[in-house]
Amino acid sequence: MALQLGRLSSGPCWLVARGGCGGPRAWSQCGGGGLRAWSQRSAAGRVCRPPGPAGTEQSRGLGHGSTSRGGPWVGTGLAAALAGLVGLATAAFGHVQRAEMLPKTSGTRATSLGRPEEEEDELAHRCSSFMAPPVTDLGELRRRPGDMKTKMELLILETQAQVCQALAQVDGGANFSVDRWERKEGGGGISCVLQDGCVFEKAGVSISVVHGNLSEEAAKQMRSRGKVLKTKDGKLPFCAMGVSSVIHPKNPHAPTIHFNYRYFEVEEADGNKQWWFGGGCDLTPTYLNQEDAVHFHRTLKEACDQHGPDLYPKFKKWCDDYFFIAHRGERRGIGGIFFDDLDSPSKEEVFRFVQSCARAVVPSYIPLVKKHCDDSFTPQEKLWQQLRRGRYVEFNLLYDRGTKFGLFTPGSRIESILMSLPLTARWEYMHSPSENSKEAEILEVLRHPRDWVR
């Protein structure tokens, strides 16, 4: 049974309409007073969303480490696969060593785990703002607060909650289905999907945290990307986690957005750990609105510029190159940013960059939906939207490496992988827009990408 969340008001809180995913009892197993109390509330309990974005820190420039090879066509993939994959190779991999924690010497009473009670309550309170409890046991997260695995899981859960809150506030009558799933090989995920809302035809925001041993096929693919991986008895422990989303509005004047941010770690036979981050965010409008394009790209550029002036132009070009529908000679949309295999200058600095990008999703996109969700449109414009969505489907099924690998990987969670597809799409034989029309205008941009900000 899925958990249905109904909007309480324009504020950041929700009503739990009915239990799901095993019911409240399953939630209480995550531990922690905050979650336990949450699980014991009635069906009309209040579940609050996370606070707004925090400030970001300045950082040195980011880049690819010595293991990365090639350009935008090498080692991409994973957006859809990571969101639902269950053994996936395209989605990055690793095993994170558990960090030991020392109790603080203040007068604060410590728990049996050696953590101050206030810090335990803070983590439980933070988790209570998510769409569902973390995939990883709360006690495990407490034992390794400084570990990147913990930081990234909390970031993707926060991102999921913030985006879902923003979408529901815009939609007005939105009900998110919250589907918590488990992977028998290790880990699981949370898929939040809204369908047939007032504003959004389909909006999916999924997170996954999976771990286990990398399959030989996955290891082979990673070696083809330049990764040097030494196995022990043919095994490579891995961990992969990320957030992935595609949002399709009903109005043809409101654009579609896609984003995903992910972290991978792999442990080799000698104990050496390889890690890297990947992700991106891109916009696919049905009709070109230059003001919207500038706003979207400027917001992403501002997030990138906090960590180096060279990042946005590099990742913008990478995005244009990756989201290319070769048989059509068109890009899927007007781009954004895209990157993979980021593993320098340090884990913390790359994480802060990814954090800045994730926190830019809502301000880059929600104003555009609010601006256009009530625009009038003609049947011809709706028809063009359906044709453009056909192109979206073509790219996802034919070119996106994460989707393709997920579909052919045993144990994959197909529903999560195909979550990115729109509810409706259309194909017409030999369709061609009129010359100098609004439809021809967007095609020109898709065939010849522009620089929207400098």
Swiss-Prot record:
Keywords: Acetylation, Disease variant, Heme biosynthesis, Hereditary hemolytic anemia, Mitochondrion, Oxidoreductase, Phosphoprotein, Porphyrin biosynthesis, Transit peptide. The keyword Membrane does not apply. It comes from Homo sapiens (Human). The keyword Glycoprotein does not apply. Pathway: Porphyrin-containing compound metabolism; protoporphyrin-IX biosynthesis; protoporphyrinogen-IX from coproporphyrinogen-III (O2 route): step 1/1. Transmembrane segments: none annotated. Homodimer. Residues 193-202, 392-428 are annotated as: Important for dimerization. Pfam families: Coprogen_oxidas. The modification N6-succinyllysine is found at K404. The modification N6-acetyllysine is found at K404. The active site is at H258 (proton donor). Belongs to the aerobic coproporphyrinogen-III oxidase family. Its EC number is 1.3.3.3. GO terms for cellular component: cytoplasm; cytosol; mitochondrial inner membrane; mitochondrial intermembrane space; mitochondrion. The record marks H327 as: Important for dimerization. It catalyses: coproporphyrinogen III + O2 + 2 H(+) = protoporphyrinogen IX + 2 CO2 + 2 H2O. Residues 43-70 are annotated as: Disordered. Coproporphyrinogen III binds at S244, N260, Y261, R262, G411, S412, R413. The modification Phosphoserine is found at S112. Residues 1-110 form a transit peptide. It is an enzyme of class 1 (oxidoreductase). The lineage of its organism: Eukaryota, Metazoa, Chordata, Craniata, Vertebrata. Catalyzes the aerobic oxidative decarboxylation of propionate groups of rings A and B of coproporphyrinogen-III to yield the vinyl groups in protoporphyrinogen-IX and participates to the sixth step in the heme biosynthetic pathway. The gene is CPOX. It is found in: Mitochondrion intermembrane space. This is Oxygen-dependent coproporphyrinogen-III oxidase, mitochondrial.
